[in-house]
Regions:
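Thiamine diphosphate
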Residues: 1-178
Length: 178
């Protein structure tokens, strides 16, 4: 029988490369709800004296924090899991109507190799729902594509002022069995 091990997100070098890329593009605010898929990036932000790691009470606070960052002259990113995206949908309308720059990295659940049936509904609804709110989406399935796609998303979100969500698939972050 074929057995696939879950990927260890702590040692995933693609996360370090993406963090470094965000910092090179002057992203200094990292708003997050604790999540295993973003564990490494959150740890980097917490350890970085030139960045601000902002723990959110829930995902709905993310868009408001990013609006505040923009109005204060800073750049930020929201780090959430797909199951929490439903909590921020209404607040995305403020982002799109105000044409605020917005970048969100979403660690996906409910796709490749998912072992928890509770993750399927929102995991499969994230992309169409976020797109319906006027947010562009791009997906990363392979570590070797991470830098190129995130660089595109950064440019689109901040230079083009087109709100963008980067969906980090379970093929990238690792299969979750529970």
């Amino acid at each position: 029988m074929f057995e696939m091990k879950a990927r260890d997100s702590d040692s995933a070098t693609w996360q370090d490369e993406v963090y470094d890329l965000l910092r090179q593009h002057n992203v200094t605010q990292f708003a997050y709800v604790p999540d295993g898929g973003h564990k490494r990036m959150i740890a980097r932000a917490l350890a970085d004296n030139a960045a601000e790691a902002i723990s959110l009470t829930n995902e709905s606070e993310g868009p408001g924090v990013m609006i505040g960052a923009d109005l204060g002259g800073a750049r930020g990113v929201v780090l959430v899991q797909s199951s929490g995206v439903g909590n921020l949908i209404n607040n995305l309308s403020i982002i799109t109507l105000g044409r605020f720059p917005f970048l969100m990295l979403v660690s996906m659940r409910g796709d490749f190799g998912e072992g928890n049936p509770w993750q399927f509904p929102m995991g499969q609804a994230v992309e169409p729902v976020v797109q319906a709110m006027g947010i562009s989406t791009v997906r990363i399935d392979r570590a070797e594509d991470a830098l190129r796609i995130v660089d595109f998303a950064i440019s689109q979100a901040f230079r083009g002022r087109k709100p963008t969500a980067v969906l980090l698939s379970q093929m990238l972050t690792g299969r979750k069995l529970a």
